[in-house]
Amino acid sequence: MFKKVLIVMAGLSVATMAHADNPTIRGTVASKCSVYTTTQGVFGNPSPNTLSTAPADGGVQPIVRYDVAIGNYYYGRITYPTSFTSSPNLTSSALEWTGDVDVSQVSVPGMSVYTTNAITYDNTVQYDLTLAGSTWFKISSEATYGYNQAFPAGSYVASVVAECIAK
């Protein structure tokens, strides 16, 4: 009888050892690069066919701040607008956009090379964020409507895209 109990217990022990489980491993990654709008842009209307963020034209340039906790892991990519996200109906498709992105303020003097090392393509400027700290970028945008055509009265909205891209 004792032998039978041992054999049954040994069989149960083997069955228990053969059991498998699939534990999960979870983690959350918090970005070490953040983007904040510090100044909303405003279009000035210096002439009937021009909308501009230039202060000389009555506009306000939008400013975004990048906060980087650990340098050399991110790119700052800023795209100025080439269309309106909201506007009155425009009867002509002859709408020309220009724009630019510039470093306006830095928290670390070494960040001054960001402008020199920037890569520009289409309407996007990419910066290699090599140092920890904060950098402010000002964006200029200008839309010119048709040949001697006035913008219709109404509200015009265009969007800047500012993002942190992991290297």
Show which residues each predicted segment covers:
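Serine/threonine-rich, low-complexity intrinsically disordered segments
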Residues: 18, 100, 117-118, 122, ...
